[in-house]
């Protein structure tokens, strides 16, 4: 349906052939959004495109005095890595559309794997677990020293990515990050950054800056969420 359409507008050259796409959409906690934002700030990513939809709330994120779309694609063409970054927590009705958009874009760009993550309730520890859509993707987890989970429930965009990718024969990896806090904590975000760097050689987070950055990014995401809710309440009264 047209009203569900999400589209990508590329504004700079993007080359991620045989590379990696990282999903930073917050659909189950915002730890992934904070980690990917920190990674973008550390690993020489540049803006590659914007992600937009008539279903997205009309909002601009002002950073360093300049307006920004709330959902964007950042790319490091040297590393062949693209990051879907978002300050929006998408409505559940858009999760399937967003996941399929990512998979279609992977096929169009001839990338090799999507890496996503979710936050699961549990004691915050150093180990992060993983699930995957194919045997090949599970092999990537094993090679990176990440324990593969045999039984789990994966909600949201990450869950749709796994199911759709299994049918299409596309490699998708979802990392399960444990946290015992309602909101993201520094340790969980740090653990995710470290694990992503194992799966995606060359990317990194500056852990010294991460604690300070994570609080700022979290506040920005929460503010965008609050402003979005206020807009929705006023629009649909």
Which residues make up each language-model segment?
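Short, solvent-exposed amphipathic alpha-helical segments in soluble enzyme
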Residues: 37-41, 99-102, 190-194
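Gly/Ser/Thr-rich loops at beta-strand to alpha-helix junctions
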Residues: 25-30, 90-92, 119-124, 181-183
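Internal, conserved structured core segments that host functional sites
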Residues: 92-138
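Short beta-strand segments
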Residues: 23-24, 84-85, 116-118, 176-178
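A conserved C-terminal secondary-structure "cap"
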Residues: 183-237
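N-terminal short beta-loop-beta anion/metal-coordinating cradle
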Residues: 2-87
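Catalytic cores of processing enzymes, dominated by hydrolases/peptidases
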Residues: 122-199, 235
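Secondary-structure boundary elements
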Residues: 103-114, 166-171, 199-203
